[in-house]
Amino acid sequence: LLIALPVGFLVIGPVITILTNMLATGFDSLLAFSPILFGLIVGFFWQVLVMFGLHWSLIPIAILQLGTMGYATALTGMFGASFAQTAAVAAMYFRLKNPKEKALVLPAVISGICGVTEPAIYGLSLPKKKPFVFSMIGGAVSGAFMTAMGVRSYVMGGLGVFGIPS
């Protein structure tokens, strides 16, 4: 604790803050350049950003859009990635042979439907690698499609089914 606390506050915290600010600037520029490309990239990398806690770099962009335009397009790229991760884990149920692993699928799918994909990522798809890659591809396709169709979010809501009304 005497070592971890100062290292966390003095080294890791500032590095993550710098990375988050750089990502936010890059994402903002990409969104202005090509919304479809933005949706593709955000959808593809969303789960990786979640793993490293860098997904918070998109929230200020969405808040700024909501405040100035009344809607946010920055949220659409990440929305489909959550469902892609959930679908990949649900599909794993039919491929898994180990009953202990199969028992993890239902709780991960339920939490994924509600917008919390960490159990699906860390418990099932990341250890198997292929489902994680397929969920990234699905997230990219859905992110590009949703931004191409002009999907907007009018309020800050969660991911998953509870975010659909927003």
Q: Where on the chain are the PLM-derived regions?
A:
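Transmembrane alpha-helix interface/packing and boundary motifs in multi-pass membrane proteins
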Residues: 8, 42-55, 66-72, 111-114, ...
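Transmembrane helix-loop junctions in multi-pass membrane proteins
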Residues: 10-23, 54-59, 90-95, 118, ...
